[in-house]
UniProtKB/Swiss-Prot annotation:
Enzyme class, broadest EC rank: hydrolase
GO biological process, one term: regulation of DNA-templated transcription
Superkingdom of source: Bacteria
Quaternary data: Interacts with the RNAP. Has a higher affinity for the core RNAP than for the holoenzyme. Its ATPase activity is stimulated by binding to RNAP.
Domain Helicase C-terminal: 492-668
Primary gene name: rapA
Taxon lineage: Bacteria, Pseudomonadati, Pseudomonadota, Gammaproteobacteria, Vibrionales
Record-given protein name: RNA polymerase-associated protein RapA
Its biological purpose: Transcription regulator that activates transcription by stimulating RNA polymerase (RNAP) recycling in case of stress conditions such as supercoiled DNA or high salt concentrations. Probably acts by releasing the RNAP, when it is trapped or immobilized on tightly supercoiled DNA. Does not activate transcription on linear DNA. Probably not involved in DNA repair.
Length: 969
């Protein structure tokens, strides 16, 4: 291929990009700019999947300025073409049009040309292509786009938050749900929607170091988003590709420490243009008005440069008011500029909360409540709504009127748009925790080794000594060697074996602090009783952990027990089990909550049994009793645990280090009293209004119902299997709702999008996917389906076919021509065009006289009456009626113009209606709620103008056609 600057080429694999221009060349690569879709592509020049665009005499070509030229002569000079001919608008002759000025929106690859050339496709491929077009159109139009395909349970408050935030332009919000309510999933859903809608192409996630892998796995497993972890080593590697390593990947995940410690890397991260910044554990960012921490400054710098920001943090009550204000300041420093003003404003929300509570309760509104609501909504006339609520209207009308008042009041609520927070108290459906504390006698082997260790290890700091005393099996191994079988005499192991034998049908999760303990416990279960167990620790790769988790999840033939180390279990959830054994205890109340959170999460169907075997007279007993009696941390979530621990830690560490528990009862009493007081403060500070707003109420239930209705879509299953067949993938039914899909030697393309080289196990069932992490959950949004549809379209699969209709009511040889047109507007994805005018199929069924019968002849039922024709016969049939086909296509082109105009008008109308009502709502709110950002209003205004232009320029093209001939035998 000989390239030259300014030449026009079209992509073979991405024809929707429009016409490309060669803008850069070097020894090995060529860069094409596709101005219509605002995309650039770099190809290897010796093997670029592009085709040179050359027009011939008689063709009509369009200039970028909008006028057309009928080509009369083609001149080539230095590899560039100039077209000479007549301008169709002014009829001026001898006009020259250089190829660089050709319109960027020219289309090619006509299906009729393929048909005339005898490149006729199989009938079932034509059918698959039409279904792909229809399904893709429906998916793009769906208001639930981006929410159906994630591997997560349908939990109302999560879906509500994601739906509310995910559609905004550059959302800047604080997600502050309590532990176990799924903030990571909410963030993932928002990211997923922003990516699918084209609003976020470059994303940076900043998390504590220990959570990097958890986020990597969650994004990949649940949302099919592949992030790259960046550390110093990765940045040095990436330097070969770019001066700024952060420019080498679109989706980047890194730790806050990494950016905090290296000014150079922080500055590089600042310079990379991100669309969305996500910060987890944002409550650890310390801030005070005069001295913000380095970590806070790092996030502040990134947040100032990035349009969209999601902060995931503890609840505002846990943070304290000032710290909570500091998070809001990161989102909008103009709005949250002064702490004192913020506190004063918060106090003014009490009447709003009272008014909404009155509406929620459904009781008759008192005059005082009505006056309050009228005053709060002073700029609108609320009397008609009051009349409906008090009339004899049906319950539904009353509920709608109530909801409208509630929505309007919510909008006035200061931080309602930037802060979402759900509590366990406000969300139903959590299991009861049954706690079983099991004191056990300490083996003499431990007593001896601990006494000796105490005598010779006197120099240890109290905290280190306390830590050591919690794990007597490790002290024993120090003296007897690592191979010593402590598990032969430890009564906790004996108890565990008996429990597992007694409950063979129950899945049991065992958590120990150390990886070595977990490995030795597995050995004990295997060697002593042949119990099927699997281990999970930080030394394993993500893939190995997945396999272990899948083995544990398997109902038949799976492991009965999963033994996890502390770090290994981070971020993994096993809701299908309800038996938790804590083989030892963590030092920290937050870690204890994390352990229980592996099972006690939203979505757990059964009550949980928590078993805590501990050795009497040891540090384990001190800690078990303090957690249980001082904090009640086993039976309930304990948001106050850390604060209480900080107050009594000195006395606690002293007891754990010395082994004496004389002061234990006093410390427990003091802790319990402190805990009660802190919890009462939290309850007092609960923001009822925020809770009502965050869980979404009735609206959240509707979203769940809508997605659940799509979940059992048999249409998807049959489409996916046909798609895999057509592209050439092997399929093997594995039972348990699972199919194994592997690449074959006869595939249409060397590698299939979204499918690993070794293949994948897939399921169409959400529940199966939730319990089996090794399976891909296939939905319309999954890359294997989206990529497959893109492949069909770009490879031109099914663009022309010939079928026979055996129908004795019609004369033999009767012709029908099925024409499928596609209407679309070439526009950048981020413009939001997909919501109003995605690629829209129009089907015409032309008879020999040029009448359209598509309204009378439905596609699927008609298709069942047709039979395929072999390629040789099909080619002969086409040759014999080529003139008729040509004539009917021309008639179809005339007819479709009206349909296209109607589609344009409908898209304009829907876009104006939807965006203008949102714009008006935000403008009205801006007057009463300073939380509405100017950028949001400006973005919608610009979007309306932009979309008007794109929709007006929407074009149609013939996507595919099928010739149907009537026969009687």
């Amino acid at each position: 291929m000989a390239f030259a600057l300014g030449q026009r080429w079209i992509s073979d694999t991405e024809s929707d990009l429009g016409l490309g221009t060669v803008v850069a060349l070097d020894a090995r690569t060529v860069t094409l700019m596709f101005a219509a879709s605002e995309e650039n592509r770099v190809y290897a020049s010796n093997d670029a999947p592009v085709t040179r665009v050359v027009f011939n005499v008689g063709d009509v070509v369009e200039c970028q300025e909008g006028w057309s030229l009928k080509v009369e002569q083609v001149v080539e000079e230095n590899g560039l073409y100039t077209y000479l001919g007549m301008r169709e608008d002014t009829e001026e002759t001898g006009v020259a049009l250089r190829e660089i000025f050709l319109s960027n929106q020219i289309r090619f690859n006509k299906p009729q040309d393929k048909m005339y050339a005898g490149q006729i496709d199989r009938m079932d491929n034509f059918v698959l292509r039409y279904r792909a077009l229809k399904n893709q159109y429906e998916q793009h139009r769906s208001p639930m786009r981006g929410l159906c395909g994630m591997r997560a349970g349908l939990i109302p408050h999560q879906l509500y938050i994601a739906h509310e935030v995910g559609r905004r332009h550059a959302p800047r919000v604080l997600l502050a749900d309590e532990v176990g309510l799924g903030k990571t999933i909410e963030a993932g859903m928002i990211i997923h929607q922003q990516v699918l809608l084209g609003r976020a192409e470059r994303i940076l996630i900043v998390v504590p170091e220990t959570l990097q892998h958890q986020w990597l796995v969650e994004m990949m497993r649940r949302f099919n988003l592949h992030f790259s972890i960046f550390d110093e080593e990765r940045c040095i590697e990436a330097f070969a590709e770019s001066d700024n390593p952060f420019d080498t990947q679109q989706y980047v995940l890194c730790s806050l420490d990494f950016l905090r410690k290296s000014r150079k890397r922080f500055e590089q991260a600042l310079e990379a243009d991100w669309d969305l910044l996500v910060v987890d554990e944002a409550h650890h960012l310390e801030w005070s008005q005069d001295k913000p921490s380095r970590g806070y400054q790092v996030v502040e710098g990134l947040a100032e440069r990035t349009p969209g920001v999601l902060l995931l943090t503890a609840t505002p009550e846990q943070l304290g008011r000032e710290s909570h204000f500091a998070r809001l300041r990161l989102l909008d420093s103009d709005r949250f500029y002064d702490y004192a003003a913020f506190v004063e404003e918060e106090a003014q929300y009490a009447p709003v909360a009272d008014a909404i509570t009155a509406l929620f309760s459904g009781v008759k509104l008192a005059d005082e409540a009505k006056n309050q609501i009228t005053e709060l909504l002073s700029e609108q006339d609320v009397e008609p709504l009051f009349r409906i609520i008090e009339s004899n209207a049906d319950e539904e009308s009353k509920a709608i009127a109530r909801q409208e008042l509630i929505d309007n009041l919510m909008d006035r609520h200061g931080t309602g748009r930037v802060l979402f927070r759900n509590t366990r108290a406000a969300i139903k459906g959590f299991p009861v925790r049954n706690v079983h504390l099991l004191p056990m006698p300490i083996p003499t082997q431990y007593t001896t080794s601990m006494r000796v260790s105490g005598m010779i290890g006197g120099k240890l700091a109290p905290e280190a000594r306390a830590m050591k005393n919690l794990y007597p099996e490790e002290i024993f191994q120090e003296f007897e060697g690592e191979e010593s079988s402590w598990w032969q005499f430890d009564c906790r192991v004996n108890w565990l074996l008996e429990k597992l034998k007694a409950q063979r049908s129950e899945k049991v999760l065992v958590i120990a602090s150390r990886a070595s303990t977990a490995l030795q416990l597995e050995q004990a279960l295997r060697e002593r009783e042949g119990i099927r167990a699997t281990v999970f620790h930080e030394g394993m790769s993500i893939l190995e952990r997945d396999k272990a988790a899948a083995y544990f999840a398997q109902e038949e033939g799976g492991a009965q027990v999963l033994i996890c180390s502390e770090i290994g279990s981070e971020g993994r959830n096993f809701q299908f089990a309800n038996q938790l054994v804590m083989f030892d205890l963590p030092f920290n109340p937050d870690l204890l909550e994390q352990r229980i959170g592996r099972l006690d999460r939203i979505g757990q169907k059964r009550d949980i049994d928590i078993h805590v075997p501990y050795l009497q007279g040891t540090a384990q007993e001190v800690l078990a009793r303090w957690f249980n009696e001082g904090l009640n941390a086993f039976a309930e979530t304990c948001p106050t645990g850390r604060t209480v621990y900080d107050q009594v830690s000195d006395q606690l560490i002293e007891m754990l280090a010395s082994g004496s528990n004389e002061a234990l009862n006093d410390v427990i009493a003091e802790s319990a009293k402190l805990n009660q007081a802190l919890k009462a403060d939290l309850e007092q500070g609960r923001d009822r209004l925020l809770e009502m707003h965050s869980n979404g109420g009735e609206k959240a239930q509707q979203i769940v119902a809508e997605i659940a209705a799509k979940d059992g879509d048999t249409n998807l299953v049959s489409f996916a299997l046909s798609l895999f067949d057509t592209i050439g993938l092997n399929q093997d039914d594995k039972g348990e709702n699972a199919i194994v899909v592997t690449p074959s030697e006869h595939m249409m393309v060397p590698s299939y999008p979204g499918l690993p080289y070794e293949g994948a196990t897939i399921t169409f069932d959400r529940d199966t996917a939730l319990s089996r992490e090794d399976m891909h959950f296939i939905s319309w949004e999954h890359p294997m389906i989206q990529g497959g549809i893109d492949l069909l379209m770009s490879e031109g699969v099914g663009t022309c076919a010939v079928s026979l209709l055996k129908n004795k009511a019609l004369p033999v040889g009767t012709l029908l021509l099925e024409l499928i047109y596609a209407v679309d507007a070439q526009a950048p994805k981020r413009s939001g065009i997909g919501r109003f005018l995605p690629r829209t199929p129009i089907r015409l069924m032309m008879d020999a006289r040029g009448n359209d019968l598509s309204a009378q002849v439905e596609f699927e039922s008609f298709n069942r009456q047709l039979s395929p024709v072999n390629r040789h016969l099909a080619s002969k049939l086409v040759s014999s009626v080529q003139n008729d086909i040509h004539r009917l296509i021309e008639a179809g082109d005339q007819l479709v113009v009206e349909n296209v105009e109607a589609i344009r008008q409908q898209a304009q109308q829907e876009m104006q209606q939807s965006l203008n009502s949102e714009l008006e709502r935000l403008q009205a709110l801006k007057a009463v709620n300073p939380n509405i950002r100017d950028e949001e209003i400006e973005a919608i205004d610009a979007q309306i103008k932009e979309l008007n232009g794109y929709i007006a320029k929407a074009q149609f093209q013939l996507d595919s056609l099928r010739l149907i001939v009537v026969s009687h035998n």
